[in-house]
Amino acid sequence: MFITGNSSGLGRGFSAAALARGWEVYGCSRRGCDLEGVHDVRCDLGDFATVPAALEQLLAGVERLDLVILNAGILGRIKPMHDTSLEELGRSMDINVWSNKIILDWLLDFGIAVDQIVGISSGAAVLGNKGWNGYAISKAALNMLLRLYSHEFPDTHLAAIAPGLIDTAMMDYLCVEPDPGEYPALGRIRAARGTDTMPGPRAAAERVLEVVGRLKTFDSGSFVDIRQLIAPEEYAALMQARQKR
C-alpha cells in the first residue's frame, strides 16, 4: 500500500492500521513517518518538480500496489469567500488536487500495476457550507479528477471517499477559532468531538480499510460517503432531509 501525507493524522492512522495487518507500507510526507516498518520518503507535494524523483526513489523495484491512498491535503482558513485570496485558493488546489495529478501521471508512466486508488475527499465537496472555500472547491475538484482518471486506469478501480469526522489537528482549529454563529456547520463538528461520531485517526483509518473493498461495488470514479457503506439508512434519511430544505 502507498499512502501520501502519512506523517500525522489520518495518513499516519492508515500506516499504523496497515502495518498491523501485516501489509507492506510505502509513504511520503513533508516531515516523514515515525512508524517502524514503513518505507518512507520525505516529499513536499507542493513542490511539483521534486515529486516524480521522490516517488521513483520510494517505489523503485515495486511492480504492483494493491492500494494507493491519496490522503495528503490542507484545510485552509474558514472565512468569507470574498476575503479568500486567489493565492490561498491556489495553495489548496495545488496540494489537494494537482499534486494528485502528478502522482497519478507518474503511476501511469512508470507502469506500476495498481488494483485500487482511493482519494480522501470530504462532505465539504458537495455541501457548500459557508466559509469552507478552498477546501470545498479543491475536494470537489479531486472528486472530478478521479472520475476523469478512471477512464485512463482501465485495470484499476478509483474512488473518492468522504471518511467522516476525524479528531485530528485540523479539529484543534475548527473547534476553537472560527465563530460557529457565523459558520453554522461548525456547530455539528464541535458537538461531535469527544464522541463516537468523531473517532481518532487510527480508528477512522480502520473504519475506512474495513470497507475499502466495498468501494468496488460503485462505478470506478465514484464519490462515496462512508455512511453509504456503514449506515446506509441514516445516510439516505440525511440526504432526503437536505433535499427538502
For each of these PLM feature ranges, what is it?
Residues 7-11, 15:
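N-terminal Rossmann NAD(P)H-binding glycine-rich loop of SDR-like oxidoreductase domains
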Residues 36-49:
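Rossmann-fold cofactor-recognition segment
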Residues 93-100, 130, 138, 197:
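Short alpha-helix in the Rossmann-fold core of NAD(P)-dependent oxidoreductases
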Residues 116-141, 146-154, 162-166, 172-175:
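Catalytic loop of short-chain dehydrogenase/reductase
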Residues 160, 179-239:
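C-terminal helical subdomain
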